[in-house]
Amino acid sequence: WVRDIYRSARAHDPTRLIEDNSACRYDHVETDLNTWHFYLHGYETLRRHVREVVEKTFPGSDFNFIGGNRQNGAPLLNSECGMVWGVDGSAGDSDLAWQYHYMLNEFRLQEKLCGFVFTELHDVVNEFNGYYRIDNTDKDFGYQAFCRGMTLRDLHAPDMVAMDCPPCRTVRAGETAETPLVLSHL
C-alpha cells in the first residue's frame, strides 16, 4: 500500500520530493528522503545514536527500511528531533541550551546528514523546550558565556565550526588538551 501511494504521488508530480513514512519506527519502504526521528538526552546517548544512524546509512543498507526494502542513496535527514522537557521521559534538570548545542554540534560533524527539523519553536503548556517562551519572548540560551557574541543563530548558520569532543571535560593544570575542529557547511 505505501509503495502504491508513493508511486501514485510520483506519477502525479515527478518534481517534488516524496517521503513514504515519517520514520519514527524505522519503517521506510520507497522514499526520496531517508529520514528518522529521535528524542534523546545526554551527550553520550545522543552521540552514539546519531553516529549509529549515519554509519548504517549507505546504498543497499536495510537500516531504517522494512519488508526487505533497502536504502537507495536518498539524502539522510533528521525529520523530527527535539528536547524532552515537560514530556514523558523528561530530562529533568538537564540544560536545554547546552543539550541543543551539542545536538547541533553532533549533526554538523556528520557529512551524510543533510539537515534536521526541530519540532518546537515556542514553549507550549507542559512542554518548555522551544526557542521562545510561551509568551513569544526570546530565551537566553547563554551561549555568549561560551564564546563572546555567540547566539542561537550561529548554530544555524551555513558555516559553523563544530567540535568533535564532549561538551565539557576537566583538565588539570599543566595538562594538554586537544579539541578536533571540523568546519561544517550546510
Regions found by a protein language model. Give the residues of each.
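Active-site neighborhood of glycoside hydrolase catalytic domains
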Residues: 1-33, 73
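Histidine- and/or cysteine-centered catalytic micro-motif in compact active-site loops
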Residues: 23, 39, 81
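Substrate-binding clefts and catalytic carboxylate motifs of secreted carbohydrate-active enzymes
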Residues: 28-31, 42-186
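Conserved residues at the C-terminal ends of beta-strands
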Residues: 21, 37, 119
